[in-house]
Amino acid sequence: MGIKGLIGFLSDAAPGCISEVTLESLSGTSIAIDASTALYQFTIAIREGSYLSSLTNSKGESTSHIAGLLNRCIRLLELGIRPVFVFDSTPPEAKSQTLAKRKLLREEAESSLEKAIEEDDKEAIRKYVGRTVRITQKENESAKKLLRLVGVPVIEAAEEAEAQCAYLCQRGFVTAVGSEDADALVFRCGVLLKNLTASNKPVVRVDLAKALELLELTHEQFTDFCILCGCDYCGTLKGVGPKTAYNLIKKHGSISRILEVRSETLEGYEAAQEYFRDPKVRDITTIDRCEANIDGLREFLISENDFSEERVDKLIERLQKARSKKTQLSLKSFFGYPPRAANITRNYTVPIKGVSPPAVVESAVDSTSDDGKDEVPSDDKVPSVNEVPTVDKVPSVNEVPTVEEAPPADAVPTVEDTSEPPSEEPDAKKRNKRVPIEVDDSLVPDNLKRFICVQHYDPRVTIKRTGASELGSDSVDSLVSHICGVYGIQSGTPDNDLSVVGEGILWPNPILQRFRSVTKDLPNSRLHELWRCSSSHGISWDALDKLYINFREARDSSVEEWDKYAPEIVDFASKVARDKITQWLDGSTSCPPRLLRRWTHLLYSRWRERYLHVYGPRMLSRYLKGEVTDRVLVREINECLPAGVECSELPLDTEPSEHNPHFVRRVPKSGS
C-alpha cells in the first residue's frame, strides 16, 4: 500500500515537487528498483489484458513476470539506464497485521472473482482480477535468476525493499528509487520515480527535499503526517485523511501531541516511527555488475520456460546491442525542455480546503537577458508568512536551483515588505522603506565568507565566456589574432558572411567562426572537409563524459559543503535579519517574529542560490561549450601547422569576472 493518498495530496498541496519525466532523460543514471512492485505490475498487466490467464510454461508455472521483466530490463539498458533490482526479504513484525488483512482481502476478492466469472461480468472480472495477484517465492527466485543471467545487479534486502532502495540512494550507489510505494520517501530516498516499469504511463518524479520545503515540514513531521495518512506498520485515526493529517501536523507538530489534545490512542505508531527512522537494511559496500550469460539465458528462456526460439533470438540481439554499446550521456537529456508538471489523479475525491502550501520563493537571480547582460528582476514580492519556515527548519539543498549568473555584488536587489505590519509597528509609513539584503563582508564570519561573499568564492569549475552575446567583436578579433600570431598561421581577410556548419550547444560560436573565417583561404582541403562533416570534431564521448563527471562532482561537493554549514548560515542570517529589521523600524527594540522569520528565510535562500547557481542545467551547457570550443580550436590549429609542429593547448589565459569568479574570460597568455 505504501502511504495512502500521499502522491495525490502532494500533487495538490506541493505541485512543485512532482513532475513528469521521460525515460530518455534518465540516461546515464543508476536506479534502485523495488522488484516486488515491478513484478506485480508485469503480472497484472498481462492478466488484465487476458482477464484471467497468465503466461505459463509446459509445467503450468507462470512466466508473465519473466516476459515483462526481461522486456523492461532490455528497454532500460538500451536507454543507458543502469537498474539495480532490490527484493523484499522477511517482513518486519510491525507489518504482520497489514499482511493478515491483505490475505483476507485477497480471499474475498477470489470469491468475488469466481462469482463474476460464473455471471460473465467482464467489468467485475477486470475489477477483481488484480486483487487476486500474488507474487510467489518461486516467481521471485526465477526473476532473480533471470536478472543475473541478463547481468543486472540483484540485492536482497534485509527486510523491506523500499528501505533498502532508500539506503542505496542515501549512500550514492543510485540516483533515484523506482517504486510504486511512496513510503520510500519516508525512508529518506531523495528522488522517487513512479511508473518506471509501467509501459503505458508517464514516469512521475517526486523530489523529497522540495516536498519538505514546500510543505514546511521537517522529516520527522513528514513521517508523522504519512503515518496518519495510513501506512503498512500501524493503523490510523478514524476519519483522518491526507488533508486532515497535514492540518493536524501543522497545528500540533507531532502525533503524540495530537493524541494528547484529542484524547485518542493510536496503537503501534511509535514502532512505525522507529522503523521509518531506523529500518533494518543490508550493509552494501559495492554493487558488482557482471556480463550477461547469453548461453544460460537462452537455456533458461527456451528450455525451462518454453519461450519461442525466434522471440528469444530477437530479445538477445537487443540485449547484446544494449550491453555492448558505451553508455553515452545524452546531450538532449542535459539540455532538453524542463520536466512537465505532473497530472496526478488523487486517491481521494474531497477537495482540499484550508491548505495553503507555500510556493517556491523566486530567485533574486534567475535569468539573463537575450543580449547576455545581467538583469536584476524586481523583488517587491515578499513571501507570505505561510511561505517562510522557522529558523530551525533548515531547507535541504539536494536539488541545485536552475539560475543564471549572479548580478554584480554592488547591484543586489532590494526588498520591500508589502504585507500588513504587526500592531506594535509605530509608523505605518515605515513599511515602504527599502532595505538592501546584502551584508558587509567584514561582518561575515571567516568560515562563512566562501558561501556568502562572492569575492571569496572558491570555484571548483569555471565557465568560459563563449556565447555570441558574451563576447564583443574586438575581444574575438584580439584572441584569434593572438592565436594566429603565436603559431605563424597566415590569416586572410575575415569573411563575415562565411557560412559555418554547426548545430547544438557549440553554436553560435564567435571564436570558432572568426578562426574559420580568417583561415578559409588556406590551401588545406582536410580542414575544409572537417568543417563540412563535423561541427564538434576533436572531442570524443569519453572526453565529454569526463567533463560532465567533473561538473557533477564539483556540484555534489559544493552542495555537501553547503549542507554541512547550513545551520551556521541560518544562525547568521537570523542575526543579520534582526539587525536589518531594527534598522527598518528606526531603532525600535522590538522585532516582530513574523518579519524575522521572513527575512531570515529570504537571506538564506538568496545566499544559497547565488552560491549554487553555477551548477544549474543551463550552466552545464555553457561549461561544456567553453571546454569543447578550446578542444576544437586546438584540433583546427594543428590542421593549419606544418609537420613537426604541434599545438597541445591554446596560448590563452583566463581572468575571473569582476562579478563572480565562477565565470572567466579568455585573454592572450603573456610571453606566448
UniProtKB/Swiss-Prot annotation:
GO terms for biological process: base-excision repair; DNA replication, removal of RNA primer. Residues 361-436 are annotated as: Disordered. One of its GO terms (molecular function) is DNA binding. Residues 124-252 are annotated as: I-domain. Its EC number is 3.1.-.-. The keyword Plastid does not apply. GO terms for cellular component: mitochondrion; nucleolus; nucleoplasm. Its cofactor is Mg(2+). InterPro entries: 5-3_exonuclease, 5-3_exonuclease_C_sf, Flap_endonuc, HhH2, PIN-like_dom_sf, XPG-I_dom, XPG/Rad2, XPG_DNA_repair_N. Phosphorylated. Phosphorylation upon DNA damage induces relocalization to the nuclear plasma. Its main location: nucleus. Residues 370-382 have a biased composition (Basic and acidic residues). Keywords: DNA damage, DNA repair, DNA replication, Endonuclease, Exonuclease, Hydrolase, Magnesium, Metal-binding, Mitochondrion, Nuclease, Nucleus, Phosphoprotein. DNA binds at R47, R72, E160, G230, D232. Residues 1-106 are annotated as: N-domain. The keyword DNA damage applies. It is an enzyme of class 3 (hydrolase). Belongs to the XPG/RAD2 endonuclease family. FEN1 subfamily. Interacts with PCNA. Three molecules of FEN1 bind to one PCNA trimer with each molecule binding to one PCNA monomer. PCNA stimulates the nuclease activity without altering cleavage specificity. This is Flap endonuclease 1. The lineage of its organism: Eukaryota, Sar, Alveolata, Apicomplexa, Aconoidasida. The gene is FEN1.
